[in-house]
């Protein structure tokens, strides 16, 4: 009986440890800052702050389910930001058309990543790392390192606008999360993505077009970067050639931390959202406690290390 109890506790800890950890850090900050942490305005602030991260993480989740990685997340976000800014400011294009072209460009960059990985056969780490340098180089060459400003006022709706008192970026985040969740769990593409990540050889033997689905997973990631770029540029009201670069590590952390939730070490959308919340709550709570920005990275690093450790345990038990 004791063995069963210990086994049950251990299984629960590895399966739902991320959710429990999220609840614990919320409780800790609620105790440390009882008059500010759980205020509605602060909750909205956290959701607003993680909106870009969650959207980038959603796209990256699809790629990582296949067992691959996309290291161009930050570079692509920066590049699409500059593209949209250039279309609106340098070419006088309509805001909505510029955003649509930006999303299409994000999909194209994702397709290029997918093609190099799936069809040319370059390892995903090397392929996306190299592509990231290329994207960043072209981005810096076009802007010469200078941001694009004087954006149309209407463009601010994505990053600063609100509907019924809730920021538009939060609506965009939840719509993206729901759409990707449905795609992964209710469509043939989603089933194929999970099959490829589970056992690529078996997926290929069962008739799944592995190369096509890999390419499409990177397309989804690229589109997520484009949507994140729209919110980021709108919020800053400027398009900086390196504005999205800082999101690379946080996006990876979000997916890795989320992989320990709900699906035994596999990346999943619900987990990614929890991962984004953990990163957001840590940043917000530590800021409320007057912890320096640099020290916050120590906390994030510890959380990522813990998450990867739990994920490794989960995967070894599955084997």
Regions found by a protein language model. Give the residues of each.
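Single transmembrane alpha-helix segments in multi-pass membrane proteins
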Residues: 24-91, 116-121, 253, 257-269, ...
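Transmembrane helix-bundle core of multi-pass membrane transporters
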Residues: 120, 124-186, 213-216, 235-244, ...
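Inter-helical junctions in multi-pass inner-membrane proteins, predominant
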Residues: 35-45, 139-142, 184, 188-190, ...
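Helix-loop-helix "hairpin" substructures at the membrane interface of multi-pass membrane proteins
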Residues: 93-99, 108-113, 117, 164-239
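Cytosolic-side transmembrane-helix boundaries in multi-pass membrane proteins
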Residues: 1-27, 204-212, 284-319
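Short loop segments and helix-boundary regions at transmembrane helix junctions
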Residues: 4-12, 69, 90, 107-148, ...
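Transmembrane alpha-helical segments in multi-pass inner-membrane proteins
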Residues: 225, 235-301
């Amino acid at each position: 009986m004791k063995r069963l109890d210990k086994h049950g506790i251990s299984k629960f800890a590895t399966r739902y440890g991320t959710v429990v950890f999220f609840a614990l850090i919320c409780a800790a900050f609620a105790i440390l800052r009882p008059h500010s942490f759980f205020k509605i305005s602060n909750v909205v602030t956290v959701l607003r702050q993680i909106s870009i991260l969650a959207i980038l993480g959603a796209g990256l989740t699809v790629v990582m389910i296949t067992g691959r990685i996309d290291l161009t997340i930050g570079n692509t976000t920066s590049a699409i930001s500059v593209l949209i800014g250039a279309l609106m400011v340098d070419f006088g294009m309509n805001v909505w058309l510029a955003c649509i072209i930006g999303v299409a460009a994000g999909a194209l960059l994702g397709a290029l990543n997918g093609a190099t990985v799936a069809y040319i056969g370059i390892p995903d780490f090397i392929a996306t790392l190299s592509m990231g340098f290329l994207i960043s180089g072209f981005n810096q060459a076009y802007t010469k390192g200078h941001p694009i400003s004087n954006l149309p006022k209407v463009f601010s709706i994505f990053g600063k606008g609100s509907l019924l008192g809730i920021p538009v970026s939060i609506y965009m985040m939840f719509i993206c999360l729901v759409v990707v969740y449905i795609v992964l769990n209710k469509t043939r593409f989603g089933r194929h993505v999970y099959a490829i990540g589970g056992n690529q050889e078996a997926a290929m033997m069962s008739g799944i077009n592995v190369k096509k689905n890999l390419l499409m997973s990177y397309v989804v990631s690229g589109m997520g970067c484009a949507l994140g770029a729209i919110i980021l540029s709108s919020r800053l009201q400027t398009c900086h050639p390196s504005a999205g670069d800082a999101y690379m590590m946080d996006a990876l952390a979000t997916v890795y931390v989320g992989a320990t939730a709900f699906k035994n070490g596999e990346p999943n959308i619900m987990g990614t959202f929890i991962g984004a919340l953990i990163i957001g709550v840590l940043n917000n709570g530590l800021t409320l406690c007057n912890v320096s920005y640099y020290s916050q990275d120590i906390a994030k690093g510890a959380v990522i290390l813990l998450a990867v450790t739990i994920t490794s345990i989960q995967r070894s038990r599955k084997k």
